């Protein structure tokens, strides 16, 4: 999946690189794909030839455009490539069911862990940088507190 965006700096020496790749792997030859969980609204809601209405939406292409993070809380300023939570949630919903296990081999700021919590998945995160590990743990725990508090509001 390619996440395309149009924010951040520009270069005068080459085209601006305004995309990130998301690699999705699965154990074994068969993989799960929950197409109904990732459908998006169609630009055309009716087949002009048959008159059939498209009510379910359509499965998106492998290039997803999302120009910024949902909220400033979703973006952490200490990691250069914080991923968008909506993008991660869509990927996680597409390839896993609730209570499945997601492995993030490059945990960074912990965005995948947060998206897993928000979609009721378990996760394992791996990271080499001990500073990132400490900060990611704190960031993931802060989402736990927010969710717990919102249950009482």
Kindly label every feature range from the protein language model.
Residues 1-135:
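Core catalytic lobe of class I
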Residues 137-153:
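S-adenosyl-L-methionine
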């Amino acid at each position: 999946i390619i996440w395309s965006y149009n924010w951040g700096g520009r270069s005068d020496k080459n085209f601006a690189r305004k995309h990130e790749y998301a690699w999705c792997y699965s154990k074994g030859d068969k993989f799960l794909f929950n197409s109904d969980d990732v459908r998006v609204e169609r630009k055309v809601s009716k087949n002009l030839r048959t008159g059939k209405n498209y009510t379910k939406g359509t499965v998106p292409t492998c290039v997803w455009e999302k120009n910024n993070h949902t909220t400033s809380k979703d973006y952490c300023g200490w990691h250069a490539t914080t991923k968008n939570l909506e993008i991660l949630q869509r990927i996680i919903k597409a390839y896993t069911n609730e209570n499945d296990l997601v492995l993030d081999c490059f945990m960074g700021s912990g965005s995948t862990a947060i998206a897993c919590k928000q979609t009721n998945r378990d996760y394992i995160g791996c990271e080499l940088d001990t500073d990132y590990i400490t900060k990611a743990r704190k960031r993931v725990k802060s989402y736990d507190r927010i969710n717990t508090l919102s249950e009482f509001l």
